[in-house]
Design a protein with these regions (language model features):
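Conserved small/polar residues in nucleotide/adenosyl-binding loops
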Residues: 190-194
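A short alpha/beta connector and helix-capping loop motif
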Residues: 173-188
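Active-site acidic/histidine proton-transfer and metal-coordination neighborhood
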Residues: 16-20, 54-57, 72-164, 171
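Glycine-rich, phosphate-binding/catalytic loops in enzymes
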Residues: 24, 47, 152-153, 179-181
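Beta->alpha turn/N-cap motifs
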Residues: 33, 164-166
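Short gly/pro/ser/thr-enriched loop/turn and capping motifs at secondary-structure boundaries
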Residues: 38-39, 168-170
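N-terminal pre-domain/capping segments
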Residues: 1-94, 98, 128, 132, ...
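Glycine-enriched alpha-helix->loop->beta-strand junction motifs that scaffold or abut catalytic
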Residues: 26-28, 156-161, 184-187
Length: 194
């Protein structure tokens, strides 16, 4: 069965507007990316709890967090990053009653394969401690932006799942027919404009 979810922040910044947009379109699952003008990674526990209550009252479940996890330079202080972003987002996922987080594979990382795979594996392990699964999205200018590198991640990082964004592959000059054929069995499908 196909379940539709949406980034409702494209309808409005405020959670009340997002609920309105989802309700008008008969969508019962949201991928939370921004709440009341704040990135999901920056909301407080109290804001997360209030958001969850409002969504549930409207008959909407949080499908996943549309997080910025991994949208950072590969040369970041990774020990600090794990605490400030990875653990924090997994904690928020628990408050919001979701077991999925969308994430990415680092900027300026094309020549840092070993470090990328090590960091991704550590992030997957942390997420598992919270009962959360990470979903890597292909995106321009991160390590996993081409079919070849996404397949490398698929083969190298156990427990990591994938979000397939055809528009992002197109932006990287990839043939969408080849990418979907190669990744179809390993991913969730995401649609957007290119």
């Amino acid at each position: 069965m196909i379940k539709l979810c949406a980034f409702a922040d494209e309808y409005g910044k405020q959670i009340t507007d997002q609920i309105e947009g989802l309700t008008l379109n008969n969508i019962h699952f949201v991928e939370l990316r921004n709440v009341d003008g704040k990135n999901i990674a920056d909301i407080t526990d109290e804001e997360a709890e209030n958001c969850y209550k409002r969504l549930v009252a409207a008959g909407i479940s949080v499908w996943s967090l549309g997080s910025p996890m991994g949208k950072v330079d590969i040369d970041c202080d990774f020990e600090e990053y794990k605490v400030k972003k990875v653990h924090r987002l997994c904690h928020l996922a628990n408050i919001l009653h979701t077991d999925k987080i969308r994430m990415f594979s680092f900027f300026h990382a094309y020549d840092e394969r070993e470090k990328v795979m090590k960091y991704l594996a550590e992030m997957v392990k942390i997420a598992a401690e919270y009962g959360v699964t990470l979903y890597h999205e292909n995106e321009k200018e991160i390590y996993g932006d081409t079919l070849e590198r996404v397949l490398d991640i698929v083969r190298s990082v156990d427990g990591l799942k994938f979000v397939y964004d055809p528009a992002n592959f197109i932006q990287c000059g990839q043939d969408s027919a080849k990418t979907i054929a190669a990744l179809f069995d390993n991913c969730l499908l995401y649609t957007s404009d290119a």
